[in-house]
């Protein structure tokens, strides 16, 4: 695998942004094995959780080893504390992720596919929210999404525990969040009314994770709306031991049915 650390300017955010990228490389040296597809690389946008950045997946998991021997490219960007959202008070991160980031990746790495069925998103916690939001908000561009302990039912969470000032800066009040495109279950309902080719979703949560009730409520509503949901609960808390194991299991699911 080849690793790239990118720093570039975002016109939407009006600042420099960082992203790490892993690309397949044909090699058998030093214990690595690698291959490249005949066509373009399928691509996984791998999103971090709150308080982390574009480096965290390579620091806390063996993601590079998990994708070696596959044609999968991995793009790891950062949203800082922006929750992959056009913030109520702050920066327009959703516009960056949905409009500018894919175009930048195509510009820098033209070997990345732009085919929906080979474009994926995954993330942990806040990143799980972002991954599912990309799939629901851009169903013509993303074929699959993986949420690991994702904050998928924010409205339910805020009914259980009042929103912090940080969350209010991101989403506004609970009333402003409810029914908006930042409310994933409302977005899911909107998308299933306007699209027939819906993204496939994989939702995983540890049985000792405080977000488990909200993973269950999100799963139930998504299935009710007609989404293809692969759901898994297994022992684990809200930590990297759980996410490392689950992203490893998710890679074959993402590539399922793909000739390699």
For the regions a protein language model found, what residue spans apply to each?
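Non-catalytic cap/lid and distal C-terminal segments of serine-dependent acyl enzymes
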Residues: 1-260
